[in-house]
Amino acid sequence: MASKQIMFDENARKTLLTGVDKVANTVKITLGPKGRYVVLDKSTKPVVTNDGVTIAKEIELHDKFENMGAKLVKEVASRTQDNTGDGTTTATLLAQSMIREGLKNISAGANPIEVKKGIEFATEKVVEYLKNKSVEVKGKDKIIQVATVSANNDEEIGNLITDAMERVGYNGVITVEDSKTMETSLDVVEGMQFDRGFVSPYMALDTEKMNCEFEDPYILITDKKINSMKQIVPVLEKVASEGRSLLIIAEDVDGDAQAALILNIIRGSLRVCAVKAPGFGNERKEMLEDIAVLTGGQVISEEKGMKLEEFSDYMLGSARKVTVDNNKTIIVEGRGDKEKIEERVRIIEAQVNIAEADYRKTELKKRQAKLGGGVAVIKVGAATETELKEKKMRIDDALNATKAAVEEGVVTGGGVSLFRAAATLDSLSLGGDRQVGVKIVQRSIEDPVRQIAANAGREGAEVVATIRAESSERFGYNAKRDVFEDLFEAGVIDPTKVVRSGLQNAASIAGMVLTTEALVTDFDEEKDDRTAAIII
């Protein structure tokens, strides 16, 4: 059994902070319109980026205890990315500030549990403030502003995202792909997306993106569970003979069938991906019929007297392209009959009109949109591969942030909404060490303004003093233009959901670090340095 090393109390917390600092100090230099770039050493060629979560994910520290701190702050970035797709750098900065300020006070004798409670209470108050100040996003101009700011002030990207949303709706499917030219453009194609990914990650043919993309694939649709290779041998023989790829949509694919498919994928003898059917119960049956109509196939169901083993060619659907990752499947340009698709949309519309329950109406409208709507594709072009990757990251961030803005509205950007929220905490009087937690949040939420100023070459304290002297809640420092002005009027705005999520995730991780009393990790006599840890 391998030896373990244990670190306790203040030593443990200080070591965690060291790890947090190494990640946060690398990430926070990218904050704001004048944020700097970070070059990542990849196996093929360096990647230049200012995307916080991308940078954070690349950092692994030699010291195992410090790496624990690094992983915790990386979790802040990942959670924020998952929730909103943007705001990871701000979230990382807030977590670092709360942890550092908290550890100072705990070292001076403050009670960690009470400090944590104070942080949680203050965070709730700031979230309330943000929701009260949030402004609903209405009109094309406001959406362009959000998208442009989130794309590091790239107006071309802002306009493209807005156009895409207008074409397919704010809840429509928008994907980002490489362009075959140097131009960045928008294309809208018919398609359907549902929230089911591949049944096994071993089916991901692109291991970097963790997805599989098929051009002109066959699509097998069934409401049965596939657990034996015998069930699908006739289908696989046809697909293999034509050199085509295959998407399997079934209740499940497991057992011998899944193992055999994965083995053939690894060997390169088959290009196949299996996903679970979307929905549940009767809704699943209806959605499978939607997919069948869209792709020109048949739902192979024993209720219809059909069996997989008795497969015929006409049962297979097809599409121009299919993309599958861990969470979703997108079918683009199904080869189904246009008239049948239109008839299916009319049937669903009639069901919407007679449905009584709101839930049922909502689900039917979603199906109608997926069947009758389209997929907007932003095709990204650039002079070099490095520039292309960086541009795609910015577009992804801007796309997610814009959707978040439509969902919860926007607040003044440039770190000002959090900065102004600090004043609302002045009236809180919790007493004892809970008040210490409030002061920690109050101090930390001013840091984004300081960091944006520092990255723009200005003195943070000077910028903070200028903003504080002005009574208008929208007054702040526009780093892009290097002027002080009404940021909301200038179009410097942030999605409320992004700011809120980043703050809540930062407070959550900070609370965990501040209440940590021991760290335990493996100890390798040959590789690991000796520290203040106890080795057992």
UniProtKB/Swiss-Prot annotation:
UniProt family annotation: Belongs to the chaperonin (HSP60) family.
EC number(s) per entry: 5.6.1.7
Signal peptide range in chain numbering: none
Any GO BP: protein refolding
InterPro entries according to UniProt: Chaperonin_Cpn60_CS (IPR018370), Cpn60/GroEL (IPR001844), Cpn60/GroEL/TCP-1 (IPR002423), GroEL-like_apical_dom_sf (IPR027409), GROEL-like_equatorial_sf (IPR027413), TCP-1-like_intermed_sf (IPR027410)
Organism, scientific name: Methanosarcina acetivorans (strain ATCC 35395 / DSM 2834 / JCM 12185 / C2A)
Location of this chain's protein in the cell: Cytoplasm
Binding site for ATP: 30-33, 86-90, 414, 494
Description of how the protein assembles with itself and partners: Forms a cylinder of 14 subunits composed of two heptameric rings stacked back-to-back. Interacts with the co-chaperonin GroES.
CDD domains: GroEL (cd03344)
Name of the protein: Chaperonin GroEL
Pfam families with a match to the protein in the record: Cpn60_TCP1
Record PANTHER family: 60 KDA HEAT SHOCK PROTEIN, MITOCHONDRIAL (PTHR45633)
Top-level taxonomic group: Archaea
